Amino acid sequence: MRCLTCLRLSFKPLCPNCLNDLPLSLKVRVLEGVSVYSFYAYSEIEELIKSKYALIGSRILPLLFQKAGAEFVKILQEKGLNAPLYGIAIDDKIKSFYSHSAALLKGFCQGNLKPTYGRLRANNTISYAGKSLEFRANNPRNFTFKGDKNLDYFLLDDIITTGTTLKEALKYLKTLNIKAHFAIALCSADE
C-alpha cells in the first residue's frame, strides 16, 4: 500500500511522517454549557475527512482520531481525571459499508475513555452536508437513546460546523438526565 499523501510505501493509508506533519490545533467551543473540543483545522484535513463517504475512510479517519485521542488522554491525566468516561458517537449507523462515526470513536477511545456503540441514533436521516442553518433548524435529528443512563458520557462527531447536531444531542441527553461531560469533534469548520 502507498501513503495517500506522499505515495511512499506504507502499511497504513497515511505514513507516520505524513500523520505527524498534520498539526493538532486544539480548539474549544461551548454549546449548551458543555465544552466541545476539536483537534484539527478543517482546511488541514479537508481531503482526508471527505474520505468518510468511501470505504477507505474506515482506515484513514481512525488514524487521525488516534493521534488526537492520545493527546486528549494526556490532558485528562494531567487534570487528574481518571474515572471511566463512555463515548457516544452521534448517529453511528452503517452507511457505505461502515459507520464513520463508530470508526472515529474506536480510534479516539484510549485509557479511561471507553467506546459505546449504537447508543444515540437519529430518527431523521436527512444529510446536513452543505445545507443552510435554516434547513438544519427545520429538520431536527430527533434522537433516541439506548443505554445506561447512569454512566458518565462524552459525545463524539466528525465535524462541528454550526453546532446544530451537537446542540440537539446535548439538549436531548439533558432531558433524560444523562450527563455528557464534554463533546469531541475531529475538526472545526469555523476557522
Identify the residue ranges that each predicted region occupies.
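PRPP-dependent phosphoribosyltransferase catalytic core
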Residues: 167-191
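Histidine/lysine/aspartate-rich catalytic loop segments that bind and position anionic ligands
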Residues: 106-127
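A phosphate-binding catalytic loop at a beta-strand-loop-alpha-helix junction
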Residues: 155-169
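Glycine-rich phosphate-binding loops at beta-strand->alpha-helix junctions
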Residues: 89-101
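A structural signal for isolated positions on well-ordered beta-strands in alpha/beta enzyme cores
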Residues: 86, 154, 181-184
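Short functional micro-motifs and their immediate structural scaffolds
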Residues: 10-11, 23
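Active-site-facing substrate-recognition patch
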Residues: 16-86, 94, 120-150, 187-191
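Short cysteine-rich clusters marking metal-coordination/redox-active sites
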Residues: 3-6, 15-18
